[in-house]
């Protein structure tokens, strides 16, 4: 039986005899077959000799071996098709995988390869040829420990088919190790001068959702960090392959995927090719590139030496001899941690972008501004630039409706600045205006939906008043949450302006002059604005009877057990917000009646001093509330007079 099973061949017995037969069936070769067999052995021996005699050559021994073996194996393929009388399909591709694809193979590494054909009918035609080639490689391995065709690994007799066939084998789990096989295919390198089918197969793997995490940059980095860890303390020996080469391999795979490094000849798949592209594109600091390159070359030199010494794959070496390389690999793993962190930061930034874009699509202006501000703050905190995030958004779109809002916001930038200028820096983060405008410009740069022009939706009108209300609602949302009094001052001021604009809209009196009047209005000092002379964010003065929510369960949770003047200030601020909703005398009376029926009003009416309680005097906070009501009533009357005058 052959490695993959007995095969039937139409070999010209006089010319090649048993060259392609299973050596267990026919251990002896005919003279003609023996001559051809020795020819292949001599080519391998000469290649080994060239490598040893060319020390100091610019090309490394492992690169020299991979280049030379590719030529020998290519010749073996052509010879086998000729000998078996099979016409080679013109589109057939053979790909090296594993160490051969990555230019890491030594004289004693396995021969990992697979075959891709264009049509299903070609599979039956070419499979017997690669069965025969496997028999030949097995015979060579028996003689010299070289080019072993692993029967359960990436084997050209087992892994053969169209791109759809091979992809189906992966998806259906019909290979020994799906993840390892997928990675081997993704890092494979063509033996013959054709690669289009390989690209098609790689694209299928990358685009398959169930494989996306398996072949992502983050996955590769984590394998370097978590799967191929440093040897245990006290270990006497280490594996050059497992403890040094594998972490570097997966780091380079992660870098190739993250930066989308590619070259048509497949050179990017080797460590030297990846390192060259990293350096050419200036993608990492030179110190980090040089470290990877240095450790890789040291490890490969040692691996080549060990394999030659033992005349087989042998990767173990004393821990003490490997210590310096292991220390450098630890630093390379640290780079992996940095890259994973950066990827996760970009993933989170992308989610924040999606949230902001969703708000645009809904026409929620204040929601968009808040989400865009969160994105800006996150990117600033994580030291991310717009150009870092832009590639992550290549498949994202902004609708014409969203674009219309962005344009209107951009046009209202100066008005936005005036609205924010009425507040102190304690309520609005410095640079907030420029930050959000900057993010709006960034959003406007993103492409629109397919086939849509970069113009706003002409049927979606965004009035200036709507934009300004959205801006002021946003300013309310970003008021400093750690300072309740300042937050309420901001809320009250913005509510006042929002209510004023809404009244202008109801009276059909929106124009640049009236909007400017609203924008330019400023709030009085906090104590005057809240009409409560003891306004404070602390519990306030010492009292015989401190106001609390103890007997008012309905409001206890809302005010988080605040006490004293701070509690009354908080309640007054909320009442101020509610009064701002009144549009006429009737609605004002209804709101006042509603507020007086609440537990909060009873807290305002409860005296904190002994005299106030004994004599049942009106508290200063109730007086403040009454003053608020009168101010609101006067504001309504003033607005009504202005409306009549304009009409």
Swiss-Prot record:
Main location (coarse class): secreted
Record GO cellular component, one term: host cell cytoplasmic vesicle membrane
Listed EC numbers: 2.7.7.108, 2.7.7.n6
Pfam families per the UniProt record, alphabetical: DrrA_P4M (PF14860), SidM_N (PF20879), SidM_Rab1-act (PF20851)
Keyword Transit peptide attributed: no
GO biological process, one term: protein adenylylation
Region (P4M region): 544-647
Compartments it resides in: Secreted; Host cytoplasmic vesicle membrane
Record field: catalytic activity: L-tyrosyl-[protein] + ATP = O-(5'-adenylyl)-L-tyrosyl-[protein] + diphosphate; L-threonyl-[protein] + ATP = 3-O-(5'-adenylyl)-L-threonyl-[protein] + diphosphate; L-tyrosyl-[protein] + GTP = O-(5'-guanylyl)-L-tyrosyl-[protein] + diphosphate
Keywords linked to the UniProt accession: ATP-binding, Guanine-nucleotide releasing factor, Host cytoplasmic vesicle, Host membrane, Lipid-binding, Membrane, Multifunctional enzyme, Nucleotide-binding, Nucleotidyltransferase, Secreted, Transferase, Virulence
CDD domains: SidM_DrrA_GEF
Major enzyme class: transferase
Location of region: Protein adenylyltransferase/guanylyltransferase: 1-339
Sequence similarity: Belongs to the DrrA family.
Entry note about domains: The P4M (PtdIns(4)P-binding) region mediates binding to PtdIns(4)P and membrane attachment.
Function as written in the Swiss-Prot or TrEMBL entry: Virulence effector that plays a key role in hijacking the host vesicular trafficking by recruiting the small guanosine triphosphatase (GTPase) Rab1 to the cytosolic face of the Legionella-containing vacuole (LCVs). Acts as a GDP-GTP exchange factor (GEF) for the small GTPase Rab1 (RAB1A, RAB1B or RAB1C), thereby converting Rab1 to an active GTP-bound state, leading to the incorporation of Rab1 into LCVs. Also shows RabGDI displacement factor (GDF) activity; however, this probably represents a passive activity following the GEF activity.
Protein name: Multifunctional virulence effector protein DrrA
Organism, as annotated: Legionella pneumophila
Gene behind the chain: drrA
